[in-house]
Every structure is written in C-alpha cells, then in structure tokens.
A protein has these predicted regions:
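Short, ordered beta-strand-loop transition motifs
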Residues: 52-54, 128-131
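N-terminal secretory signal peptides
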Residues: 27-85
Length: 158
C-alpha cells in the first residue's frame, strides 16, 4: 500500500497535479546555502525548513537537509542525500490540539518524498509521559548499511 502511494504521488508529480492527503511539504523554507557550484544548472545546497506541528500549537521544528542540484535535481528526478539535522522548539505557550499517542510507535507528523520513488524523509513525534516531553525524530526510509540516518530533538512541556 505504501509503495502504491509513492507511485501515484510520482505520477501526479510528473503530471504537475497536486493530490490532497499526500505527505505535507515544508511549511516555510527559511533559507539555503550552496555547497557545490554547477556552471549550467542549479547548485547542490543545504536548505533550512520550518515545520509547525499540526497537533501541538506553538511547536516548530527546524530541519536542515541536503538537496541535490543539477538538471535532475531541478526536475525532481535526483535522489536527495539522507543527511539532516533537526531542532524543535516551543515558540509560545504549548497547547495540544488533539490526543497525542503515548504508544511506543509514535506518530508521523510530516513526510516528504526525497526521490522520485520509494524514499521519504519523515518526522515522527513521540510523547514521553514520564518526563513530560515531546521527542521529534527525523529519519529516512532509505536504509544505509542496514539502518536509516536519524536525528532527534526534545521539547519539554510545562
């Protein structure tokens, strides 16, 4: 089922059609720096994006990630590297908008395709009830030497 969704998303992306219910993209790109100069095509870069948690008011996650340039990158055909960092912060009084799962599986809060097929970047939220904190995990669905790259950030709840 998951692969079918990726195939459908890829077909619609190539056709230039948006589909409701597919993974959300960054709500705001904060900035970017070029890392590799390419004379005739877009440069490779590191982008900084902000994602606001849809179920937790006033929690924003800032993600830096590598983005492949070149003509294939510009057309969305290149695979972005699985390297990223995350920092989530309370930017005001934290309010839960709905029930936050407390199980060990967590909840995928954001998801973004990072290649045309079968590779996603995901941000999952976990609730540590003992310490009263939200833990955000960014990870890639692509396995590197048997496990995905990942990074975490913790937001204390008062």
């Amino acid at each position: 089922m998951m692969r079918f969704r990726h195939v459908v998303a890829a077909i619609f992306a190539l056709a230039g059609v948006g589909v409701t219910g597919l993974p959300a993209v960054a709500q705001e790109q904060i900035g970017a720096v070029s890392t590799t100069f390419r004379l005739m095509s877009p440069n490779d870069k590191v982008v900084i994006e902000r994602y606001d948690d849809p179920k937790v008011e006033n929690v924003s996650c800032y993600l830096s990630r590598a983005e492949t340039g070149g003509w294939s990158g510009a057309m969305g055909l290149a695979e972005d590297p699985s390297r990223f960092s995350i920092a989530c912060r309370a930017v005001g009084p934290v309010t839960m908008k709905g029930k936050i799962p407390t199980d060990k599986k967590g909840e995928v809060v954001f998801s973004e395709d990072t290649s045309i097929m079968f590779k996603e970047l995901r941000i999952s939220r976990f609730y540590d009830t003992q310490k009263n904190v939200l833990v955000y995990l960014v990870w890639s669905t692509k396995l590197i030497d048997g496990s995905p790259y990942n990074s975490i950030s913790v937001v204390p709840l008062n």
